[in-house]
Amino acid sequence: MKNPQVFVISGPGGAGKTTIVEKLFSKEQIKKTFLKGVTVTTRTKRPQEKDGKDYFFVNEEEFLRLKKKRFFLESQKVLDSYYGTPKILYLLAKKGNKGLILCIDVKGGMVLKKDAKIKKLTTIFLAAPTKKELYRRMKKRAEKKGTIQKRVELAKKELQFSKYYDYLVTNRNIKNTLKELEAIVLGEAK
């Protein structure tokens, strides 16, 4: 079993990470070659999300229990919720001789970039084209105004980390962004 190629796709909320990763996995070549990482979180499930497909939703007590047992490759608290990447994803990718695509927050991406156990890691920072567009996307997701403002402030901080990522992709439209990400992922995986 060789070390899997791991891709971390990070960026501010509203940049389109989840949508792009979902569309990437509708491509046969991607499905055959990669495992999709599903994050564990304590945040409230949005109406369109499915437990086990988009995230594994747990309460804070369960999350902290898993963290104490070293269940996660990395875990972070973002705003008022915890997020964690299960170690088992990396092991399953390794065992299945597949790559791994993770859609995680910026702090988590930086933690994995420094992790010596992950030998083949490519980081991709996904950004919205403008602050106004980011705000519009968050509003469309029906987030509360107070939450949107917190996320916009967080996005400003997260954008400062884009220079540490291997790639910066601006999500102006889904079709072009998907093509660009697919080219990066398939190109780097060779």
Report the location of each language-model feature.
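Walker A/P-loop
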Residues: 18
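ATP-dependent small-molecule kinase phosphotransfer cores
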Residues: 39-100, 106-108
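Conserved phosphate-donor/acceptor-positioning beta-strand/loop module used by diverse small-molecule
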Residues: 101-106, 118-141
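The conserved Walker
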Residues: 12-13
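Post-Walker A helix-loop "phosphate-sensing" segment adjacent to the P-loop in P-loop NTPases
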Residues: 26-36
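The feature captures the helix immediately C-terminal to the Walker
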Residues: 21-22
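Small-molecule kinase domains that catalyze NTP-dependent phosphoryl transfer to phosphate-bearing small molecules
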Residues: 143-184
